[in-house]
Amino acid sequence: MTKTDYLMRLRKCTTIDTLERVIEKNKYELSDDELELFYSAADHRLAELTMNKLYDKIPPTVWQHVK
């Protein structure tokens, strides 16, 4: 799967808590290469949830608000 595929699946998560649960579950199930793509998509989704806005590409200024 690609980062975009993971991102589309993660967009079903509507809260940060749900996203964290999905991240925790997949941490043990994915290979290292898949995990790198998954974490990238998860960070992207976390930024979207934090700003309450969907992005194709996250602006650099948004990352200062993400914990």
Curated annotation (Swiss-Prot):
<dbReference type="Pfam" id="PF05321">
    <property type="entry name" value="HHA"/>
</dbReference>
<dbReference type="InterPro" id="IPR007985">
    <property type="entry name" value="Hemolysn_expr_modulating_HHA"/>
</dbReference>
<comment type="subunit">
    <text>Monomer. Interacts with H-NS, in the absence of DNA.</text>
</comment>
<protein>
    <recommendedName>
        <fullName>Modulating protein YmoA</fullName>
    </recommendedName>
</protein>
<comment type="similarity">
    <text>Belongs to the Hha/YmoA/Cnu family.</text>
</comment>
<dbReference type="GO" id="GO:0003677">
    <property type="term" value="F:DNA binding"/>
</dbReference>
<dbReference type="InterPro" id="IPR036666">
    <property type="entry name" value="HHA_sf"/>
</dbReference>
<keyword id="KW-0238">DNA-binding</keyword>
<keyword id="KW-0805">Transcription regulation</keyword>
<comment type="function">
    <text>Modulates the thermoregulation of VirF, and hence the yop regulon, as well as the expression of the enterotoxin gene yst. Involved in chromosome structure and DNA topology; probably by means of compaction of DNA in conjunction with H-NS; probably requires H-NS to bind DNA.</text>
</comment>
<keyword id="KW-0804">Transcription</keyword>
